[in-house]
């Protein structure tokens, strides 16, 4: 018996290998999935007969789900139902269990249920997934009357009537969408369960079967809910996704459903995509994938809406006239006749204007969605150059209401891509990195959604400054249009901000916008990265940084628009990017720039600023009973840049801690509320290796440094401040963890022995698939006798500790550091000097660059 199973197992292996060869040679995927199902039939029937279950009328073997539909993928589960009569003996049931064991022994991944008709029907009446799989039953072997009885008992007359089944499947899809963040355009999409995936096709067939009692979706053409063209589109989407899924199973050697980064690369190679000068093979493949997903989701939406109208509202219509062209039918907008778009193509955009103007409209009727899709050819050059068209499009953003849902529909139905050629080029365009979580078109729409959220009460607590600014914004449509165009030139090569500004300029001219409005939109697109780059890469506590930033703002109002766009952009790029740290940096930059712009004051010199901050801090300390003489004695040892970098409240806190301390090093760990992180403050006798020790200890405690200010005082004491975040990029509040880090820092900083070893940690799975070439650039700051070192490289555990050891080895002194991580990419700025306290010369830069590249390349754990 064991030998028989071994032979069968080998036969299955050989057959699947042949299918893989056929598939690699471009064999038809529908034929392959059917061949696999039929082949598995023969194996199961053979095992069923071997276990003597085919005799008499006691048992029935049924294929369910995709196997029942004859659509078996390479490593899909094989869903089986074994029905038996009430009178079967224990011996016969044991044979059924033995049959299942044999299936497992020959390597078949079988999911099964052994039950009676009545028990199965009872379960189906309570479980949506059971009734759905039963509707795909296929008789393999045994007494067919049992299957017929199950069909009868699970008929809509007895359970799950059409409308109830429809609502349940709709809710199931909504829950599935929510699980995947309402978008199919994720970095690693799920081909089976993600929005626009294969489940979106299966739900259409399931509802059709339940309501119309059809067996195949093609039969729906006769019922009028799908056209020949739409069926061909669905068939194309299905075959594309089947091919990708079969290849994914083949490459993974298991039932993998997620297109992870490593498989994306392999799939692109398998399907023959090749790198081009400005777009990678993987990006081309994923762009095609996302276009199919988009089309699939669009058809899913339209047909589900048709089912809703047919199954739920087939006799209940409440009509409300909107104008001569549109009306509401049960709160869904529709054309008043099928000639509307042909007679006036501008009405295509007018429909979406109504969706924004009337937030109570729940959606678009299926017949009108179909008419939009069939009328896209009307949106030609003449349509796009029409002044009426231009006015309608811009007015979509001028209603004062949220345009996000309407724009999402415009994107799904293909209207945006037909109206804006430049938008068509970024539709489905992914960026192969960990920083950008969505395709460019979906990211753009998420940015617009975020802008709208700033107006809503439920988001006011999360974004209080944004809520305050946007309510006073003179023309919100400018912000929306800036958002629409900010990434419009991605994927072309070159500076997408500059290229996008050209597109924005052409758009504003074609849409007859006022000169001032046009200037602001174009400026927003050109400088949409200015605020985030300034906040994350430069010293925003330096008055010169604020002055340079403000010089790029043509008018004070530009700051409000830029701040809102920056926050919306970061939040719409990746859900993990926004945190209290970035929030605090941008707010501080905003407020500093606002003060500078509105007061129209001359730039205060550093001495004046230091004096002001000292006085405020002094007032705080004196109110706590500390002598001004003691304070001044201590402060006389501090460098001026310390007072520039810290607020009066923080200066007072540090001063108090030092004066109250009886031993060194002084190490304080506490929340830094204004900066959204946790502050590590260190005061101790000078020690060259203290930056290396600190970065190593913090790395071992799995925290990340966001900013570092390193100062050696005139009394040869070190005055260092770090802002750190936990593994989730948040300030940590765990007091025990803070005490552990504090103790570890005190022990190692006081120790004159060896440097602490850095614990070796594996790179995350995602990080291993990206290779950012290490880039190092130097800029001399002659005013401060420092050199700015800008470093770009792959993120990895312990990176900063590695860099600090290079600095220590080469006697490089660090004064300040700004740490920015964007997905797999690290962009760090270090302000350094040589051991004599001056900017690095050419030779020192060369040696440092070579050493950093070498050590970083060795630190890939």
Swiss-Prot record:
SMART domains: HDc. Residues 679-760, 788-861 form the ACT domain. Residues 1-321 are annotated as: Uridylyltransferase. PROSITE patterns: ACT, HD. Pfam families: DUF294, GlnD_UR_UTase, HD. It catalyses: [protein-PII]-L-tyrosine + UTP = [protein-PII]-uridylyl-L-tyrosine + diphosphate; [protein-PII]-uridylyl-L-tyrosine + H2O = [protein-PII]-L-tyrosine + UMP + H(+). It comes from the Bacteria. GO terms for molecular function: [protein-PII] uridylyltransferase activity; phosphoric diester hydrolase activity. Modifies, by uridylylation and deuridylylation, the PII regulatory proteins (GlnB and homologs), in response to the nitrogen status of the cell that GlnD senses through the glutamine level. Under low glutamine levels, catalyzes the conversion of the PII proteins and UTP to PII-UMP and PPi, while under higher glutamine levels, GlnD hydrolyzes PII-UMP to PII and UMP (deuridylylation). Thus, controls uridylylation state and activity of the PII proteins, and plays an important role in the regulation of nitrogen assimilation and metabolism. This is Bifunctional uridylyltransferase/uridylyl-removing enzyme. It comes from Legionella pneumophila (strain Lens).
């Amino acid at each position: 018996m064991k030998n028989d199973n071994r032979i069968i197992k080998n036969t299955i292996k050989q057959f699947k290998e042949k299918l893989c060869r056929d598939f690699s040679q471009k064999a038809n995927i529908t034929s392959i999935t059917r061949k696999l199902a039929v082949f598995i039939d023969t194996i199961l029937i053979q095992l069923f007969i071997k276990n003597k279950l085919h005799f008499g009328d006691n048992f029935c073997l049924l294929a369910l789900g995709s196997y029942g539909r004859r659509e078996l993928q390479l490593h899909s589960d094989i869903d089986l139902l074994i029905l038996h009569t009430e009178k079967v003996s224990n011996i016969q049931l044991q044979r059924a269990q033995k049959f299942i064991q044999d299936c497992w022994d020959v390597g078949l991944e079988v999911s099964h249920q052994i039950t009676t008709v009545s028990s199965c029907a009872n379960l189906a009446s309570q479980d949506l997934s059971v009734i759905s799989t039963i509707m795909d039953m296929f008789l393999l072997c045994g007494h067919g009357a049992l299957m017929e009885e199950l069909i009868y008992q699970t008929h809509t007359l007895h359970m799950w009537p059409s409308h109830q089944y429809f609502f349940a499947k709709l809710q199931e899809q909504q829950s599935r969408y929510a699980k995947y963040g309402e978008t199919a355009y994720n970095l690693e999409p799920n081909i089976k369960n993600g929005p626009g995936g294969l489940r979106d096709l299966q739900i259409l067939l399931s509802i059709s079967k339940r309501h119309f009692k059809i067996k195949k979706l093609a039969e729906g053409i006769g019922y009028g809910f799908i056209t020949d063209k739409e069926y061909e589109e669905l068939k194309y989407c299905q075959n594309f996704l089947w091919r990708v899924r079969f290849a994914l199973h083949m490459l993974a050697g298991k039932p993998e459903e997620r297109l992870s980064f490593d498989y994306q690369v392999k799939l692109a190679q398998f399907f023959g995509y090749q790198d081009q000068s400005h777009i990678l093979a993987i990006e081309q493949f994923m762009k095609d994938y996302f276009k199919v997903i988009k089309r699939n989701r669009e058809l899913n939406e339209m047909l589900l809406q048709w089912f809703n109208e047919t199954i739920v509202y087939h006799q209940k219509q409440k009509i409300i006239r909107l104008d001569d062209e549109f009306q509401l039918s049960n709160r869904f907008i529709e054309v008043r006749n099928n000639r509307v778009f042909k007679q006036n193509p501008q009405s295509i955009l007018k429909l979406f204007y109504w969706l924004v103007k009337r937030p109570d409209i729940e959606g678009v009727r299926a017949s009108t969605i179909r008419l939009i899709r069939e009328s896209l050819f009307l949106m030609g050059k003449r349509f796009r150059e029409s002044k009426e068209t231009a006015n309608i499009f811009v007015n979509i953003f001028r209603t004062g209401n949220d345009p996000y849902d309407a724009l999402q529909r415009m994107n799904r139905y293909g209207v945006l891509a037909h109206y804006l050629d430049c938008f068509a080029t970024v539709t489905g365009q992914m960026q192969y990195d960990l920083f950008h979580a969505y395709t460019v078109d979906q990211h753009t729409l998420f940015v617009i959604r975020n802008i709208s959220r700033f107006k809503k009460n439920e988001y006011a607590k999360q974004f209080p400054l944004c809520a305050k600014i946007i309510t006073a914004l003179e023309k919100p449509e400018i912000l929306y249009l800036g958002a629409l165009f900010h990434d419009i030139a991605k994927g072309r090569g070159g500076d997408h901000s500059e290229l996008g500004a050209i597109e924005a300029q052409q758009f504003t001219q074609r849409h007859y916008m006022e000169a001032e409005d046009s200037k602001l939109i174009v400026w927003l697109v050109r400088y949409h990265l200015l605020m985030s780059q300034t906040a994350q890469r430069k010293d925003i506590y330096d008055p010169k940084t604020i002055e340079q930033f403000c010089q790029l703002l043509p008018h004070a109002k530009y700051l409000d628009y830029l701040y809102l766009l920056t926050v919306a952009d970061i939040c719409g790029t990746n859900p993990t990017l926004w945190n209290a740290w970035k929030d605090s940096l941008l707010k501080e930059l905003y407020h500093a720039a606002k003060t500078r712009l509105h007061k129209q004051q001359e730039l205060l010199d550093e001495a004046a600023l230091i004096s002001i901050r000292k006085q405020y801090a002094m007032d705080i300390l004196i109110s706590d009973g500390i002598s001004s003489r003691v304070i001044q004695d201590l402060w006389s040892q501090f460098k001026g840049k310390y007072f520039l970098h810290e607020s009066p409240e923080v200066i007072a806190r540090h001063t108090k801690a030092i004066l109250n301390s009886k031993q060194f090093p002084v190490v304080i760990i506490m929340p830094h509320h204004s900066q959204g992180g946790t502050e590590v403050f260190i005061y101790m006798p000078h020690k060259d290796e203290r930056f290396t020790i600190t970065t190593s200890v913090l790395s071992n405690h799995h925290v990340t440094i966001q900013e570092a200010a390193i100062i050696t005082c005139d009394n040869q004491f070190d005055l260092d401040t770090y802002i750190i975040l936990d593994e989730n990029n948040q300030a940590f509040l765990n007091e025990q963890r803070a005490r552990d880090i504090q103790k570890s820092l005190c022990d190692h900083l006081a120790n004159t022995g060896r440097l602490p070893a850095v614990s070796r940690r594996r790179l995350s799975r995602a990080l291993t698939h990206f290779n950012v070439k290490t880039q190092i650039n130097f800029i001399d700051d002659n005013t401060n006798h420092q050199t700015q070192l800008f470093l770009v490289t792959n993120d990895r555990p312990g990176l900063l500790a590695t860099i600090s050891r290079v600095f220590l080895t080469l006697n490089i002194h660090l004064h300040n550091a700004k740490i920015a991580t964007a997905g797999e990419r690290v962009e760090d700025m270090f302000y350094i000097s040589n051991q004599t306290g001056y900017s690095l010369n050419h030779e020192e830069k060369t040696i440092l660059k070579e050493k950093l590249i070498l050590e970083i390349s060795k630190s890939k754990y």
